[in-house]
C-alpha cells in the first residue's frame, strides 16, 4: 500500500489468476489450457503477418476476425464484439450494461472475476446459490434484477445448464441484459448464440483460449443484438481503440476457418475427460458431471488442500479453491494421457 493510492484502489480486491509456474518440468493441470496446440493454419497465418506492416496500427474494428466469427455462427458482423481476451470483453460488459439501481445476479459458485468487476465499477450484486448438486436453478433468477450473468458450463464446477433452461432465464427478465459466459461451451454444450436473434437482451461471450488453443494470443468475443454491441464499442473506443493486434486478428480468423483441427482436438479433450472421470471414480473420487475441459472432484476420505499439496510435491499442479462450499474439491484441467498418468501416479496410494 502506498500513500499515493486512492481510497478506491486501496479497497479493491483483485482477481488472483491461476499459477503459471516457471519450471517447465511440472505437469500443469491448473488453468484449463488446451493440451493440444493451435491450428497449424493459425500459426501459418501469423507467420505470414510478420512483415514490415507491424509498424502500422492494426484494424481498430478487427473486420477480418469479426467476419470470420459472424460466418462461423451465421450472424451479422454488427452482432459481434471482439476484445483482448474474454476477460476484457466481460469488463466492458459490466461497465456498459450492468451499472443500474437494482442488483446484478450471478451464482454463488462462479467465475471469481465477477465480484471483482462489481467492485471495480461500483455495481451492486447478489449471488444466487447453486442447488445441492451444484446446479443452476433457472427459476431462482426470476426476481428483480438489473442484469444476470452466469458461465455455461459453470466454472469451476463444469456443470452444464441446458439451453431450454437458459432460455427460461432470458424470458423471465426481458428488461435486463442476460449474459451467458460460454468460455467452455465447445466441450459439451449447445451455444446460446442460436438464441440471439430472438432475444434482444441476450449477450453471449466466448474465448479462443480454450477450445481454439490460443490462450497466449488473448482473443475474446461477444455476440448479441447490435444495440448491445454498440454499447460495448463505445466503451472500447473510450478505453483502447486497438485491443487486438495483427497476430490476434489473422490467427483468430484462421482458427475459426480450420474446423477440422478444432473438431479433432476438441474430441480428444472430451475423450480424455471421460477416461479420467472413470479412473478417478475408481479411486473413490466423487466427480461432478462436466461439460468443460476440466473436472471438479472430491474424495470422501482425503482433504482437498492436502491432496493438492501432495500432488505438487510430485510435480503435478491442480487448482484448489478455499471458498466454503467447494473447499473439499479439486479442479483438474484435462491434459494429455501422459499428464493424466502422472496425476494418477501421484494419487497411487489413495
Swiss-Prot record:
Q: Which reaction does it catalyse?
A: L-histidinol phosphate + 2-oxoglutarate = 3-(imidazol-4-yl)-2-oxopropyl phosphate + L-glutamate
Which residues are recorded as modified (N6-(pyridoxal phosphate)lysine)?
Answer: 210
Signal peptide residues on this chain, from the entry's feature table: none
Q: Which InterPro entries match?
A: Aminotrans_II_pyridoxalP_BS, Aminotransferase_I/II_large, HisP_aminotrans, PyrdxlP-dep_Trfase, PyrdxlP-dep_Trfase_major, PyrdxlP-dep_Trfase_small
Q: Which SUPFAM superfamilies match?
A: PLP-dependent transferases
GO biological process annotations for this chain's record?
Answer: L-histidine biosynthetic process
For whether the record's keyword set contains tRNA-binding, the answer is: no
Pfam families in the record, alphabetically?
Aminotran_1_2
Cofactor dependence is on: pyridoxal 5'-phosphate
**Top-rank taxon:** Bacteria
Keywords, in A-Z order:
Amino-acid biosynthesis, Aminotransferase, Histidine biosynthesis, Pyridoxal phosphate, Transferase
- Residues passing through the membrane, by range: none
GO MF, one term, reads: pyridoxal phosphate binding
Q: In which pathway does it act?
A: Amino-acid biosynthesis; L-histidine biosynthesis; L-histidine from 5-phospho-alpha-D-ribose 1-diphosphate: step 7/9
E.C. numbers: 2.6.1.9
Which leading EC class covers this enzyme?
Answer: transferase
Give the UniProt family note: Belongs to the class-II pyridoxal-phosphate-dependent aminotransferase family. Histidinol-phosphate aminotransferase subfamily.
Tell me how this protein assembles: Homodimer.
Q: What is this protein called?
A: Histidinol-phosphate aminotransferase
What species is given as this protein's source? Pseudomonas syringae pv. syringae (strain B728a)
Amino acid at each position: 500500500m502506498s500513500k499515493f493510492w486512492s481510497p478506491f484502489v486501496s479497497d479493491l480486491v483483485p482477481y488472483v489468476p491461476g499459477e503459471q509456474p516457471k519450471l517447465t518440468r511440472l505437469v500443469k493441470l491448473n488453468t484449463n489450457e488446451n493440451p493440444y496446440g493451435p491450428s497449424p493454419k493459425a500459426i501459418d497465418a501469423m507467420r505470414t503477418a510478420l512483415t514490415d506492416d507491424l509498424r502500422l496500427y492494426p484494424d481498430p474494428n478487427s473486420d477480418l476476425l469479426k467476419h470470420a466469427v459472424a460466418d462461423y455462427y451465421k450472424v451479422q458482423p454488427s452482432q459481434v464484439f471482439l476484445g483482448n481476451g474474454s476477460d476484457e470483453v466481460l469488463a466492458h460488459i459490466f461497465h456498459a450494461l450492468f451499472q443500474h439501481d437494482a442488483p446484478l445476479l450471478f451464482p454463488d459458485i462462479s467465475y471469481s472475476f465477477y465480484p471483482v468487476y462489481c467492485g471495480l465499477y461500483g455495481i451492486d450484486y447478489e449471488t444466487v446459490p447453486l442447488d445441492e448438486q451444484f446446479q443452476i436453478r433457472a427459476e431462482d433468477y426470476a426476481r428483480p434484477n438489473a442484469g444476470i450473468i452466469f458461465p455455461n458450463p459453470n466454472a469451476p464446477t463444469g456443470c452444464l445448464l441446458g439451453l431450454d433452461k437458459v432460455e427460461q432465464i432470458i424470458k423471465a427478465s426481458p428488461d435486463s441484459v442476460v449474459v451467458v459466459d460460454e468460455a467452455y461451451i465447445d466441450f459439451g454444450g449447445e451455444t446460446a448464440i442460436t438464441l440471439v436473434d430472438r432475444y434482444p437482451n441476450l449477450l453471449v461471450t466466448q474465448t479462443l483460449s480454450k477450445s481454439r488453443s490460443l490462450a497466449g494470443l488473448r482473443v475474446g468475443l461477444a455476440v448479441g443484438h447490435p444495440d448491445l454491441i454498440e454499447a460495448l464499442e463505445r466503451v472500447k473506443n473510450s478505453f483502447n481503440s486497438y485491443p487486438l493486434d495483427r497476430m490476434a486478428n489473422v490467427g483468430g480468423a484462421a482458427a475459426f476457418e480450420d474446423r477440422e483441427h478444432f473438431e479433432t482436438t476438441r474430441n480428444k479433450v472430451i475423450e480424455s475427460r471421460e477416461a479420467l472421470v472413470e479412473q478417478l471414480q475408481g479411486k473413490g473420487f466423487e466427480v461432478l458431471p462436466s461439460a468443460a475441459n476440466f473436472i471438479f472432484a472430491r474424495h470422501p476420505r482425503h482433504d482437498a488442500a492436502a491432496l493438492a499439496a501432495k500432488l505438487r510435491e510430485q510435480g503435478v499442479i491442480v487448482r484448489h479453491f478455499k471458498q466454503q462450499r467447494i473447499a473439499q474439491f479439486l479442479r483438474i484441467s484435462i491434459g494429455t494421457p501422459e499428464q493424466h498418468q502422472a496425476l494418477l501416479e501421484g494419487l497411487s496410494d489413495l
